[in-house]
Every structure is written in structure tokens, then in C-alpha cells.
Amino acid sequence: MRIQALSLFLVFCLCGVQAQVKTSQIPTWVTPTEYSQSPAIDKNELSQGTLQLLRDNQTHLVKETVYIRQVTQVIDNAAIQEAGTINVDYDPTFQELVFHEINILRNSSSIDKLQPNNFQLLRREANAENYLYDGSMTAMVNLSDVRPGDIIDYSYSIKGFNPIHKGLFSNSYTFDGYSPVGKINVRLLSNKPLKYKGFNGLEKPFLNKINGLNEYTWTSTDVTPLTYEEYDPAWNINYKLLLVSAYDSWASVVNWAVNVYQENQPLSDDLSSHIEQIASATEDEGERIQKVLDFVQEDIRYLGLEEGIGGYQPFSPNQVYEQRFGDCKDKSLLMASMLKQLDIEAYPMLVNTTLKQSILDFLPSPIFFDHCVVKVIDNSGKVYYYDPTISSQGGSYAKTHFPDYRYGLVIKRGVREFDQISSRSENKVEVKDEYRLDSIGKGAILKVKSVYHDAKADQMRQYFKSQSLNAINKEYEKYYANYFYNIKSIEHPQLTDDVLANRLQVIEKYKIDSIWQPMEDKKNLIEVQFVPNSIDGLLFIPNVEHRKNPVSLDYPSHHIHDITVHLPAAWDIQSEIESVEHDSFDYQYRATYIPFVNQLKLHFEIKSKKDHITVEKFSDYSRKVNDLSNKLGYVIYTTSDGSSLTEFETGNGTLKIVGLIAVAALIIMILVVRSNQSARNDAYRRRGGFY
């Protein structure tokens, strides 16, 4: 996992304070894996005070059992707290946990620490704050007398595969990470041939026959850590990854999903009545689509019960309608069922919210999806996509924002390939700052009008619904305090929401006590800086010339920031204009002075054209960025006593006007709101399922 999100844990102890776990000898089918206590790795790369000597994963597909062994050395005292606690998660609805060994190796001796009565069984809902409950259990044991230099060696088996897959096995394994590992071993035993695929130089397995079974073994030793780079796209598979799957095609995954999403009962009277009310109240097909979408998004609250097959199989539309909650697959099936009852073609569709185009390189399997949405085809044949888990969306049915998931697999018999999805949204943000400056050296009044479109409007609408006006006002004040000293809000932000057009406007008003600041290294000079902060917050300058990974861009994205300054006196300002066109973005800058009203107008605009910069294009892009970095802002300056500028002499002659400054660096960076999706992705990676 490239990003580990910090989660709040709701912990419920079951069966009292202590509970006995099952124990047994190591299964006879497991092959002992040797490892070195002194691997050839750079110990300066270690983090958190531990060295993982062995990561061993062996799976017997016929017995539906996974054997895990972890061997970790404690390097210093700081690691004892974490290394001395063993946690193993499993799903009790279809899995059984059995521990085999827990040993501490110290000075050539082995200390047996497997005491079944010392275990605690906990129910830890790691994603409860995001309304996801997977029912998993955690067996936890705290080891006594752990010391620096100890090697902790433990192993266990988890018996049972999720029955939803009906014996079709698939999984993924990583062979590196952000800390070095002495040895990584993956071994699979199967009575049928397996499809496998490795990424980034992962070698082919060692193949063997053992007791009539196909044996596949992958081993990596002295594993060096990955190099972390900021803004590496989530879809970029830059690590050694192994995929294994028994599914022979994406069509077979579709057939699996059709059976899992099959509606085995007619719609209930209550649900049918609700659909009939929608039909009676509307005549237009688009209105009906909109009504159903609004109902599923706003009236069916998001909550997922993911135990066992619940991670993949939706509840029936009748149950979801009655209980008024569901996760992504529940909401999607309900929405599709309601639309079909209205004679509108609709299907649930599986997506991966982060893999995007990389999903095309994966082996077919349902475990590589983490989300479910809806595809709708109107009577004219036009296609629309909707995410029923998003709330507070604006826009008509034809212009509802759909995230850039890129590819989706429609759950419809006969489908053999992905739908390619192009976002219709521009996600424009328009900000207009108006400064009215008092006399020179004094304060100013700042009025800000921000207009949000598409996904940006959806996000702001949800933000205003989830926060009090007082809290928002304080947060806005705190934000502008980064730019101006002693700034106070004059009134609460004023919200105007055109839901149908999905256009949300916010007006703010502030008083700045002292907007002028002394210029650095310039005696008797004061200045005012004007920064397009809506763009400034998006951007940063590359600090390296070359990269190993692509750079994520905020896409689709269009930001316009206009600044109007009412000056307290005449200024000698020259108009300027500049534009930059790049294959990944367009940039426009314009400065205009209107002398008869002493008004300065600044225009900054940037529009992304791609969602990333390739490694090959990075150097060229970096040069463009550095050329622009001195133009993202404007400063005016004068003497501290307000004397005539035309009479003030500098070393370079008469000081007359303002200058462009390097207020911030420039590059478009990704700012995707995950709301709850990050947590959903973490849950998916941990155990599988659609959220």
C-alpha cells in the first residue's frame, strides 16, 4: 500500500477479556522456508526500528488454507511497543484462525511464547467512521519480555475462502515496499493450472509437481525499498506485483457478477408504489432518471455491512428500500432496478477508483474492483454514468458529475470488455478578489466572490451542509491569515446555490487592518502583494530535474482567478500579457491598469489538459513551470511616507511601478476529494469487496 491512512478504531472485546485461540502443528503440506539473519541490505534504510527478515505466504487452494509466517528482528527500544504486539485479522463468517508458533530467538536460544490463553479476540471496525462494517475479528496477543536484538518468529493459518467466489481463486502479492526485507516467499498449490502475471521485473515462478498438485513458487531476497516520490499517481504500478487468477476472461467475471447481482424476487409493493409515484409525477425520461438518482443518493444513507459474502453480494432492492441504507453495490442495484421498472435501461457497473487505465493490465478477477456505480442508456441510446454514493450533487440528469474512474465493467450478460468513460465535467472554479485600499500604509477591505462548477460545486455544497456557518467563517479567516496579518471577517460567507445548473457561489468580506508590509532589504519602502491563492494552493515547483514516476495532475480542472485593486492614488503601471501552451496545461496571465479610476486588474488562468505528466515529458514540463514561477503574483510598492513615486530615486533610477514577484511556484497538482473513498480503498485492499 503506498499510502497508509490513519483510521479511528472502534474496538469491542468479545468473550471477556481473554479468549483461547486454536493451535496446531504446522500443516504437513507447508514447505519450511530458510532465511538469513544477516541479509545483504542497507540498514540505514530501516524505519520504525525493525527489520523484516522473512515474509512467507503459502496457499493450498484445494484445502482453502493460507499459511503465513513473519520473522522480524527488533533493532532498538523504539520498536518494542509495536513489534511486541501480534495482530491477525480474519472473517469468522467463513474463516478459521489457527496459530502454530510464536517464538522469540535470543542468543541462540528459542523462547516459546505461544500461550493460547493470552490472546484477546477483538472486533475492530477500522472503517466504522466511514460507515463500513466488515465484521472481521482480530486475534491479538502482547508478548512479554521483548528486548532489542530479539527475533520474533510466528506463524498461523487461516482456513476458508470466501464462498462468493465458488472456488475460483485470485489474489495479489507485493514483493517490495518502503522498507527493506530479507526474503519474500510466495508458494501456491493447486490441482488446476493458474494464470499469473508479474510486474516490474518479477521473475517467473519455480514450477513443480508435488503429490499430484501444481506447485508455483516466487522468491525475492535482499529486497531493497522503493523510492518514494510525491504525487506519484495511484494507478502507477511501480512496484513488483504478482497477480494470480483462475478467471479466464473478463466475460467470466461478468457472468460471475450477473449471478451475484441477480434479482430473485419481484419488487415489493412499497417499492413498486414508490416507483409508480415517480412515474405519475413525471413525463420526461430525464426527469425520471433524476428523481431515482436523487432518491438513492439522498434518501438511502450510505452504510455497508460487509461480512463474508456481503463484501461482494448486494442486498435485495426490497431490503435496501425498506432499511433505507446500503453501500455502493446496494445503492447501484436498487437504482438500476427502479429505472428498469420505469422502462429505462440501466445496469450496475464495477470500477476501480484508483487504478484507472491500469485495470486493463490486470488479470480478470472481481477482487480487483473496489466500487460499484450505474450505467444508464436512455431511449435515444445516449449513455450516462452515475455514482449513487455521492450526495449533494447538482446538475440535471444529463450533466451530473461522474468521477474520472476511466474504465468500468458493466454487469450485463454478454459483456466482454470495459466501458471507457470520459468525464463531461470541467470542474471550473472562478474567483474574483476585490481590494479597496485605504490611504497608503493603512488597511483595506477585501471582497471575495467564488463560483464553483461540477464536482467542485458538489464538494462545496457538501462542505456547507456538514459544517456550521460559524465554523466555516473561522476556517476561512484562518486561511486568509496565511496571507494577511490581522484580518477579520466582516460578515459570514453568503451562499447562493443554483442546483440545477450545479453552480454554487460564495461571497466573503474581510477587513485587513494593515495590508502594507515593509519590503525586505529595502529601507523606507512598503509593499502589498496580491496572490491568486486559489491557484497558489494548487501549485508547487519541481525540486528535482528528473523523476522515476509520472506526476499526477488535477484533472479535469479549470481555475480562473481575477483580482481587482482600487488604489488610493495614481500609479504608473504598464499593461502586461503572457500565455503558455503545453500539452498538459494552458496558462494565461494579464495585468491591466485603468488610470482614470486608479484601478489595477489582474487575470490568472490555468486549465489542465491531462491527468499526469509522463517521465519523458517531465524535464520539458519542469522548464515551463520554472519560467512561470515568477509570475504567479503581483506586488505594488512605494515609500513608507507616501511621497511621490516620481521623486523617489533608487540605485536603478526613478522607482515608478510595481513588479512581478515569485510568490509561489507553479505546477498543477492533484487535489481529488475522497471523501470516504480512501477508507473504502484501504478496506478493499485489506480484504476485498465493493464499497
For each predicted feature, which ranges?
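Compositionally biased regions
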Residues: 8, 37-39, 679
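Bacterial N-terminal signal peptides
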Residues: 7-15
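Bacterial N-terminal signal peptides that target proteins for export
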Residues: 1-6
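Cytosolic-side junction of a single-pass transmembrane alpha-helix
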Residues: 670-679
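Cytoplasmic C-terminal tails of single-pass
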Residues: 679-691
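A sensor for short, sequence-defined functional sites
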Residues: 20-670
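Intrinsically disordered, low-complexity segments enriched in small/polar residues
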Residues: 14-15, 47, 686-687
